[in-house]
């Protein structure tokens, strides 16, 4: 959260150059199931090849809006006059928060197209690896948006939290999207509250 109520901008939508993303290889390996281990050289080389290909394809984006808000009780917060049941793990983290940054980031439709081509080739090993890479790209987009927000509003803030984690019901994604423009960054919400493109993050 950011505690200053005087801001030059209430909404920022930005394209994120792939080269600006901090892609942690070890996070990719963890997503592939290696934990703290390092995969065999051929798999590491495949990861690097995929990252090079995706760097030329992906058009990562991010958007955030700033809203006034408050903690209502031990499990609820109110943001932009919308109530969220975030649960008893997340709500205390927003203690004394006066403003909230509602955000969405995405690796983009180009990533989905890349994976679709791999599936068409029935290259399931590459599909598995691309899925791990896509998850790390999406989280790296969140980190980059936070950096840009920090430069604009250099105040203390919490970690980002998303529906579906730490006891926050994923169905509240629908309410969250009410605080964002229609199809923010090209991201659409399905009836089951999943986001398309698939490698997107909101919170």
Regions found by a protein language model. Name each.
Residues 7-127:
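Active-site helix-to-loop segments that bind/position phosphate- or nucleotide-bearing substrates
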Residues 1-6:
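Short, Lys/Arg-enriched N-terminal segments with co-localized hydrophobic residues
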Residues 107, 155-203:
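Short terminal or interdomain "cap/linker" segment that borders an active site or interface and mediates
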Residues 111-113, 137, 167-170:
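Short, well-ordered, mixed-charge alpha-helical segments that flank or form enzyme active sites
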Residues 60-68, 147-162:
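Flexible, glycine/charged-enriched surface loops at secondary-structure junctions
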Residues 48, 52, 56, 139, ...:
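A broad, structural surface signal
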């Amino acid at each position: 959260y950011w505690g200053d109520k005087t801001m030059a901008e209430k909404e920022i939508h930005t394209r994120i150059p792939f080269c600006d993303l901090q892609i942690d290889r070890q996070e990719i390996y963890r997503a592939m199931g290696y934990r703290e281990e390092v995969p065999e050289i051929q798999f590491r080389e495949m990861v690097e090849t995929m990252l090079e290909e995706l760097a030329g394809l992906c058009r990562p984006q991010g958007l955030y809006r700033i809203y006034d808000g408050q903690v209502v009780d031990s499990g609820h917060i109110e943001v932009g006059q919308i109530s969220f049941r975030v649960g008893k793990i997340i709500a205390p983290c927003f203690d004394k928060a006066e403003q909230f940054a509602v955000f969405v980031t995405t690796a983009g439709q180009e990533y989905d197209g890349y994976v679709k081509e791999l599936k068409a080739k029935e290259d399931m090993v590459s599909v598995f690896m691309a899925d791990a890479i896509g998850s790390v790209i999406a989280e790296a987009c969140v980190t980059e948006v936070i950096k840009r927000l920090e430069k604009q509003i250099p105040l203390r803030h919490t970690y980002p939290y998303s529906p579906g984690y730490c006891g926050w019901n994923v169905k509240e994604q629908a309410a969250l999207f009410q605080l964002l423009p229609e199809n923010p960054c090209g991201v659409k919400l399905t009836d089951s509250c999943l986001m398309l493109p698939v490698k997107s993050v909101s919170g």
